[in-house]
């Protein structure tokens, strides 16, 4: 016996004397455009801004050859962070978008091994020099003994994050800083 819906057919199937069981036959699969539109419609204004910024980043990053040689882009998400692998599960690069403070950041996120960040911190002046930071206080160090993860990050003021004219500059800064950190 067959019953039909828009996305699948359902058959009643019985083998020998067993109890009848439903058998689903998928006849229509959701299309990715419709899924993307549905997902976007459910996002808040801030989430849409974050998604649009990371999409812009993915479009701008290939223009920066040093960045593209070092990193693999990932699918943009409606979240405040965008992670880049560095070939180790112990740490990764993390870029963030802070819509409240209107700034970007790039830094190293270490999952558990606090010694990694401690070694960087003990060479703070050298780290600042390599990253092209004049004032070492521009590096924010987050070493909390009560948390597993630790990190350092560099902040970049953006003005109004809603002003998309600022985004090219922000994307270029992120690409440059990530290459320097690596």
List PLM regions with ranges.
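Single conserved hydrophobic/aromatic residue that forms the stacking wall/gate
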Residues: 1-7, 11
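Polyanion-binding interface signature
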Residues: 39-158
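Ampiphathic alpha-helical segments that act as solvent-exposed interaction surfaces
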Residues: 122-134, 158-182
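Tryptophan-centered motif/residue detector
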Residues: 24, 33-34, 54, 79-83, ...
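C-terminal helix of von Willebrand factor
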Residues: 9-39
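Generic recognition of cysteine residues
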Residues: 11, 94, 103, 171, ...
